[in-house]
């Protein structure tokens, strides 16, 4: 299987998982996923695939289905991609700064994808302002602190 075919498979899996999901501003969530993937595409295949899959585990409900997604990612893309996707997947009840970002920072692929994810979130936060100014301000502070934390 070629690298392009693997990238296409990753995008297909992300589309299946995210389905009709929308972001907080009401835009199709896959727009965010593909924007993050595009922003890291020059870093290489692994970064692009992880970007496409970066929210698949976290956004899969119910929990039982997460095991299937994890298995599909490991079987399809191997341990390097799997480890990065797991590292970038926030766990329920996990502290964002004390636990999650520390784990992300330990995986070079997850780190670069998360930085791109945060930057994309900051760029697109304007869509929230008309819907929920308070939430947009909270997220802006959170993302800026996360960028500082990750370096």
Question: How does the language model describe each region?
Answer:
Residues 1-151:
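Active-site helical microenvironments for divalent-metal-assisted chemistry
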